[in-house]
Regions:
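Short, acidic, small-residue-rich periplasmic hinge/interaction motif at the N-terminus
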Residues: 1-45
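Conserved C-terminal beta-signal and adjacent last beta-strands/turns
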Residues: 337, 348-349, 549-553, 607, ...
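Face-selective signature of the C-terminal outer-membrane beta-barrel domain
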Residues: 287-309, 325-462, 507
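Gram-negative outer-membrane beta-barrel transporters
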Residues: 563-576, 585-695, 733, 745-746, ...
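Structural signature of Gram-negative outer-membrane beta-barrels, strongest in the C-terminal barrel
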Residues: 205, 346-358, 421-575, 591, ...
């Protein structure tokens, strides 16, 4: 982003989006007032103020952004109720899908631009059509050296150190190195998060009009997934009452009978992931080269290349396991940016072409994850799925990343089709974005993009599965569902995709702008972890040609000499959303909502941000789930998969709050002492789908639902709030000590998980914690 300093505020302290331009939304460098989307620019000052370490914290700084637990380490949030796409300096990070996967590091982050709605034509839409998160990475200064050292520790075993240095190396060349070491424990029993990150950047001015920007990032993370606790029901949410009891039949991936006979209150530190053998390791490498040739003030060429590599595994002894083994993406994109005039009309063009190749080898096993059978009041050694029963559920041993032996289900096993897949996707595209400024009041922006995509996918466990007896010949009459009845591989044809947008912006005065945007696009919808795509046994268009439609309008205000910015937006969006086991089915979602955001910074001593969003999502077909809420007596694990819903009813999308509000205030005295406060409020959240059940056609329905006529109401997390506060002191011009209190009132807050497991996993937010950070800057 290009810097514009106002009101005497130093670059590092600026939070006003009107003081910068950004190309994240449309590829053109636009002021936020001229951008016909609701976009939020998160500056370094805002990210540091809340110590943002993962996308779950975005909900404290922007509207319509909410992250469910994502099995412990969300790597993308939901925006407007849908998962988002992640970009690095304008280039897509392919290894995201539903928030689950390798944890990301913020060691390389300078600022973040969050654009609500699907990515425009320059970036190309992906499965995360809720919004795009474009990370602008740290770059060195050509004129001065800077050094920052940061040490942080808290009362819940957080231990983080950062060293960041950069500046000119020689005439026309600058470099920067940032190293972060996170060696944290956890509030929860036997949990840890150890992440080492090394980021480096070089900036070379080869000539006065040719620059090269290079960055590389290596992140190594060893951790344990945090799935929270099981046996979710309303009493557990309301007062912590946990039902105890064990399995009365052999533990299997489906159909285990569990007799719940007692109650207790679990220690708040208890989670299901405590057994020995549970663990995860992820290695993530990103290398990027950006070349810019400025032919003149009105014509430039930008070539951007990103190589993205991931190698990881995860195993939960309860049992879940997956791996992304030796997976990588490489993309090269060339933009031609031209400014010209035709009569009185000023034109800005960004057109170009791109090619991306994505190889993801993903192996999963959630076939043997009978979450409700484990009694978390017992010894953690009992939270283990019997290895001898893995084959019965379709899982076989294989070698995951790092040579680790885990159990996985072949992708051609029909009951869990394509959840294991060796995916090789090609995507070539051309694009055009054109802005026409007719007068100071009126501008029109339109964009067009065409993609050609082709997929080669195969089952990496096919031969092993056949040898283990999972093929049709060894299925004992359970085919075609519970056997490897799907083909080993598929090579699709080339498919064409379109993407188009048109926007009108009207500014009656310089301080006010109004916009209306229409965006319709097709995209590839990944259906396995880490962005893998599988089409074994299905029509490839179900994954390679999904669609979304967005209509959005808004008002923006730049007031009080650029010290107050207010943005409002209303929108309607339609898209296909993944539902059910593994997200293998689709439902059409109809999303409406409204957002308001405000930034206020009258001086370098004070800033404040606030936002509110309302979201309402209706599904054409219901979102299924695994278990009914836990109840006293006999429970049948996986019983809710037997639900048949009554027709002629409306289904609301579960798992996200309709209302989200946040506010942040930061005040600094002239003597270096400062204070900070932050509040987040979330509306009620249903853990699973609610609705009327067809009792005649459904199976394994609990008696209480039969008695009330099949009116199923999901457990609901009530209104919640989190209040954080901090005091800091800057002294001797270079040093800052900051004392923070998170969850100041020690609220018993809860975070839901993916709605399919909404009655199986729920996470308690840790109680009040104390954090001390010391920073030195030179």
């Amino acid at each position: 982003m290009d810097e514009v300093v106002v009101n005497g505020i130093r670059r590092g302290d600026l939070i006003m989006p009107t003081t910068v331009t950004s190309g994240a939304a449309f590829g053109l460098d636009l002021d936020v007032m001229d951008t016909p989307r609701n976009n939020t620019l998160l500056s370094k000052a805002q990210l540091d103020a809340l110590n943002v370490q993962n996308p779950g914290s975005f909900s404290y700084l922007t509207s319509s952004s909410y992250s469910d637990a994502s099995f412990g380490q969300p790597n993308i949030p939901r925006i407007r109720g849908q998962y988002a796409d992640l970009f690095l300096n304008g280039m897509r990070d392919s290894f995201t899908l539903n928030g689950y996967g390798a944890p990301i590091s913020f060691n390389n982050v300078e600022s973040i631009d969050i654009v609500k709605g699907p990515a425009a034509v320059q970036a190309g839409p992906g499965a995360g059509v809720g919004g795009s998160i474009d990370v602008t990475t740290k770059m060195p200064s050509m004129t001065k050296f800077a050094l920052t050292a940061d040490i942080e520790a808290d009362s819940q075993q957080k231990r983080v150190a950062v060293f960041d240095v950069g500046g000119p190396l020689m005439d026309g060349l600058a470099g920067r190195l940032s190293v972060q070491s996170n060696d944290s424990g956890s509030y929860y029993h036997d949990m840890f998060f150890h992440q080492q990150s090394i980021y480096g950047a070089l900036l070379a001015e080869v000539t006065s009009n040719y620059t090269i920007a290079f960055n590389a990032d290596y992140v190594d993370t060893r951790y344990r997934e945090d799935d929270g606790i099981n046996r979710v029901n309303q009493a557990l949410i309301d007062n912590g009452t946990y039902l105890t009891g064990g399995a009365t039949s052999p533990i299997a991936g489906y159909g285990t009978t569990v007799d719940l006979t007692g109650t207790t209150t679990l220690n708040g530190r208890t989670i299901i992931d405590e057994p020995d053998g549970t663990g995860a390791h992820a290695q993530h490498i990103k290398v990027q080269l950006i070349q810019t040739l400025r032919v003149n003030d009105d014509f430039s060429i930008v070539n951007n290349t990103l190589y993205d590599y991931i190698n990881r595994y995860n195993q939960i002894m309860a049992y879940y396991a997956d791996t992304a083994k030796g997976s990588y993406t490489i993309e090269n994109k060339t933009d031609f940016k031209i400014n010209f005039s035709t009569g009185s009309v000023k034109n800005n063009l960004d057109f170009g072409f791109t090619y991306r190749y994505a190889h993801v080898l993903d192996i999963q096993n959630f076939a043997n994850e009978p979450v409700s059978v484990y009694d978390l009041s017992q010894d953690p050694s009992t939270f283990v799925f019997p290895a001898a029963n893995q084959l019965y559920g379709g899982a076989i041993p294989y070698t995951a990343a790092d040579g680790r032996i885990q159990y996985g289900v072949p992708g051609s096993y029909a009951a869990y089709a394509n959840d294991t897949i060796d995916s090789n996707l090609q995507d070539g595209a051309i694009f055009l974005e054109h802005r026409m400024q007719f007068s100071p009041q009126f501008s029109l922006l339109y964009g067009l993009r065409g993609d050609l995509v082709q997929l080669n996918d195969s089952d990496p466990l096919y031969n092993q599965g056949i040898a283990a007896g999972l093929g049709p010949d060894g299925a004992n009459g359970f085919c075609p569902t519970y056997c490897m009845s799907l083909p080993e591989s598929q090579h699709t044809s080339w498919y064409g995709l379109y993407n188009g947008n048109i926007s009108l912006v009207y500014s009656p005065v310089e301080q006010v702008s109004a916009y209306l945007t229409y965006n319709k696009a097709q995209y590839v919808d990944a259906n396995a972890n880490d962005g893998a795509v599988g089409t074994l046994g299905v029509d490839p268009t179900t994954q390679l040609r999904q669609g979304t439609l967005l209509i959005e309008g808004g008002l923006k205000f730049d007031l009080l000499n650029k010290s107050l910015f207010i943005s409002t937006a209303g929108f309607k969006q339609e898209r296909a959303v993944p539902v059910g086991v593994g997200g293998s089915q689709h439902s059409q979602a109809h999303i409406t909502g409204a957002e308001i955001e405000a930034n206020y910074q009258p001086s370098a001593r004070f800033f404040a941000t606030a936002s509110y969003s309302y979201l309402h999502t209706t599904l054409d077909t219901p979102s299924g789930f695994w278990n009914y809420p836990a109840q006293m007596g006999s429970n049948f694990d996986g019983a809710a998969t037997g639900i048949v819903w009554d027709s002629n009813q409306t289904f609301q999308d579960p798992g996200i709050p309709q209302h989200l509000f946040n506010v942040l205030a930061n005040y600094k005295l002239e003597n270096g002492l400062g204070f900070q406060a932050n509040l987040q409020v979330t509306g009620p959240i249903e853990t699973t789908q609610s609705g009327y059940i067809n009792l005649t056609d459904s199976t394994n329905v609990p008696q209480y639902l039969i008695d009330n006529g099949g009116d199923y109401k999901s457990p609901k997390i009530p209104w919640q709030f989190t209040l954080n506060a901090a005091a800091f002191y800057t002294f001797l011009d270079h040093y800052t000590a900051k004392f923070s209190i998170y969850n100041l009132t020690s609220e018993h807050n809860l975070v839901n998980d993916y709605p399919f497991y909404g009655n199986d996993f729920i996470t308690r937010v840790p109680p009040r914690s104390y954090d001390l950070t010391f920073t030195a800057k030179f």
